[in-house]
């Protein structure tokens, strides 16, 4: 017989009755019934009930003292449970093991939190003792699901002719939109590597190298703040690139992968392919977001022209100063109490709005609300037609500069969807957001900057860049850039790449980069493009976010084995941490006085 186990804890069935077995695992639960002690033994695979009887008093007494989460090896005989003790919630629920011997392989200390329930413990405690947290069923299953998803992705990609690669982790800094994690070089004092924010340049270089279809389950590193759907520090993406493709080719390649993946790992309804295509400007108008949740049926409308000549002075004056007005319908909300409308106004103000106007349309067509009395019958009819409002509905209004008004309307739309329970249940709604602006104004400097990926191809190519003589014209340029969105979560950005050096130099010069700086920062790729680069494009869906959706987790840390906390700290391994002066000296690094003072405190 094996030293530790003949079976796992999910394996034994009624057909095994009478068999002598050996099992190893963790003490999940213990119940003392006087003349019987029951232990639920748990391993990676499941749970089985172990029984200790008073036929062996010493063994039963020893079992009654076992601490939860101690690791034990048990030898015994499989017996059938009586009819009234069968547990149909367990695969092993028709049998139990009558113990004749057990060995404590490793005794557990007092637990910092309970393992055998899903009751929440403080997150910092969970992360500090992640090895315990990972034993909990839900989190344990999430990590198994993650492995299964990645394995299936590999199968799907290889079936489509993609080759898996590994690209460097130590590389050069690249403007991907976030801060780099820098790694000092001992051999080259004063110089630094950067951990890749994405394998962007390398995957493009592989296309130039003659490989046709690349993919990688790629680790990416970005020094950015945490969010519910974004883990600080490190994340993984399904990174892919293809040669000789158009935007539609990329869509038609990744859509069946997403459809197959979500259908395999969920029973929920998944959007049929092809997924809906929504241009960026249309998305910002209709949904107030570039990552719309299409489960929400509310459509935002622009009603600026209706209010331009109205008697509602506040909106009329805002419009005269360059603002717009957006209408957000609230279906069947006309009869909601005043507290509902007050609550919505408070929410809008908390999001930065100056206020939130509204009108209620009764089932008979009568209006209620401060805004209504300033609109003529013709204007009210026009409003109902433009915003698709029916009797029995309400409608909210925001007025501000275009970008802010769009964002505020989007926030109100999301909140209304939640408050009115409008989201379609049990479904995954996919869409593509296309035609992103190539440039944007940097909020801090007021200068032209890339809006997303600087390596994307501008629509219209070099001619479009050269003909855009004003800031306004530059901001109207679009890129062959796209996002795939599911249930309001951006899963990925992608683009058809700029593979022509002359267009790249021009695009970067508009964003304030000299040719010398471009050569210095992207010399390897620019040089490669001068030796025959194929048209190419790609995308990189986020693995963590995909798993988060399929696991129905509310926080991305629930699908990562060892995540950082919201302050980008690893509480288990105590990172980041100060290092010895000797190590800093080898790297030619000197701490600032304030940092040195903090280091001495530790």
From Swiss-Prot:
Complex and partners: Homodimer.
Cellular component GO terms held in the UniProt record: cytoplasm
Encoding gene (name): aspS
Family, as annotated: Belongs to the class-II aminoacyl-tRNA synthetase family. Type 1 subfamily.
Positions of ATP binding: 222-224, 490, 542-545
Reaction(s) this enzyme catalyzes, per UniProt: tRNA(Asx) + L-aspartate + ATP = L-aspartyl-tRNA(Asx) + AMP + diphosphate
UniProt cross-references to Gene3D superfamilies, sorted A to Z: Bira Bifunctional Protein, Domain 2, GAD-like domain, Nucleic acid-binding proteins
Annotated GO biological process: aspartyl-tRNA aminoacylation
Residue ranges, annotated region (Aspartate): 200-203
Binding site for L-aspartate: 176, 222, 452, 497
Pfam family, one: tRNA-synt_2
Enzyme class: ligase
Annotated site residues (Important for tRNA non-discrimination) in this chain: 33
Species the sequence originates in: Rickettsia akari (strain Hartford)
Localization: Cytoplasm
UniProt GO MF annotations: aspartate-tRNA ligase activity; aspartate-tRNA(Asn) ligase activity; ATP binding; nucleic acid binding
Protein name: Aspartate--tRNA(Asp/Asn) ligase
E.C. number(s) listed in UniProt: 6.1.1.23
Role of this protein: Aspartyl-tRNA synthetase with relaxed tRNA specificity since it is able to aspartylate not only its cognate tRNA(Asp) but also tRNA(Asn). Reaction proceeds in two steps: L-aspartate is first activated by ATP to form Asp-AMP and then transferred to the acceptor end of tRNA(Asp/Asn).
Keywords assigned by UniProt, alphabetized: Aminoacyl-tRNA synthetase, ATP-binding, Cytoplasm, Ligase, Nucleotide-binding, Protein biosynthesis
Signal peptide annotation: none
CDD domains assigned: AspRS_core, EcAspRS_like_N
């Amino acid at each position: 017989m094996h030293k530790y186990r003949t079976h796992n804890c999910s394996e034994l069935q009624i057909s095994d009755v009478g068999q002598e077995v050996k099992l190893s695992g963790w003490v999940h639960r213990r119940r003392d019934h006087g003349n019987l002690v029951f232990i639920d033994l748990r391993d990676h695979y499941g749970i089985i009930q172990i029984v200790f009887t008073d036929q062996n008093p010493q063994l039963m007494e020893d079992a009654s003292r076992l601490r939860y989460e101690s690791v034990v090896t048990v030898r015994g005989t499989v017996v059938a449970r009586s009819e009234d003790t069968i547990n149909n919630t367990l695969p092993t629920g028709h049998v139990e093991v009558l113990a004749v011997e057990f060995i404590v392989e490793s005794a557990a200390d007092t637990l910092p939190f309970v393992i055998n329930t899903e009751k929440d413990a403080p997150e910092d405690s969970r992360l500090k003792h992640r090895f315990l947290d990972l034993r909990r069923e839900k989190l344990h299953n999430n990590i198994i699901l993650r492995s299964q998803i990645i394995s299936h992705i590999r199968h799907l990609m290889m079936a489509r002719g993609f080759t898996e690669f590994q690209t460097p982790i130590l590389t050069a800094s690249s403007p991907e939109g976030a801060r780099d994690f820098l790694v000092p070089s001992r051999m080259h004092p004063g110089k630094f590597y950067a951990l890749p924010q994405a394998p962007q340049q390398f995957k493009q270089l592989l296309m130039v190298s003659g490989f046709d279809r690349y993919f990688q389950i790629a680790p990416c590193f970005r020094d950015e703040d945490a969010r519910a759907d974004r883990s600080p520090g490190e994340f993984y993406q399904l990174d892919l690139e293809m040669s000789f493709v158009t935007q539609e080719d990329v869509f038609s390649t990744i859509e069946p992968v997403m459809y197959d993946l979500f259908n395999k790992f969920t029973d929920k309804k998944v959007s049929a392919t092809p997924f809906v295509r929504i241009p960026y400007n249309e998305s910002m108008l209709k949904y107030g977001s570039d990552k719309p949740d299409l489960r929400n049926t509310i459509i935002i409308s622009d009603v600026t022209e209706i209010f331009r000549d109205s008697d509602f002075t506040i909106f009329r004056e805002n419009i005269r100063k360059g603002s717009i007005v957006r209408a957000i319908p609230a279906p069947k909300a006309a009869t909601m109490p005043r507290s509902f409308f007050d609550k919505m106004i408070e929410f809008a103000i908390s999001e930065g709005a100056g206020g939130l106007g509204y009108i209620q349309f009764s089932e008979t067509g009568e209006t209620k609300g401060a805004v209504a009395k300033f609109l003529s019958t013709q204007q009210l009819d026009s409003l109902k037609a433009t915003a698709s409002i029916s009797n029995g509905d309400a409608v909210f209004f925001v007025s501000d500069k275009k970008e802010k008004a769009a964002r505020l309307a989007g926030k109100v739309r999301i909140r209304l969807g939640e408050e009115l329970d409008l989201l379609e249940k049990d479904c995954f709604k996919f869409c593509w957001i296309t035609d992103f602006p190539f440039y944007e104004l940097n909020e801090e400097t007021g200068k032209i900057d890339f809006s997303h990926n600087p390596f994307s191809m501008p629509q219209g190519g070099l001619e479009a860049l050269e003909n855009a003589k004003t800031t306004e014209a530059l901001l109207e340029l679009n890129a062959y850039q796209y996002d795939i969105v599911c249930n309001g979560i951006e899963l990925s950005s992608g683009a058809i790449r700029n593979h022509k050096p002359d267009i790249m130099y021009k695009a970067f010069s508009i964003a304030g980069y000299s040719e010398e700086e471009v050569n210095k920062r992207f010399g390897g790729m620019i040089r490669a493009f001068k030796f025959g680069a194929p048209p190419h494009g790609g995308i990189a869906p986020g693995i963590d976010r995909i798993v988060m959706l399929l696991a129905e987790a509310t926080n991305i840390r629930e699908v990562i084995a060892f995540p950082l906390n919201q302050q980008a700290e690893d509480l288990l391994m105590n990172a980041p941490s100060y290092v010895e002066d000797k190590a800093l000296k080898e790297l030619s690094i000197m701490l600032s006085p304030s940092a040195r003072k903090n280091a001495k405190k530790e």
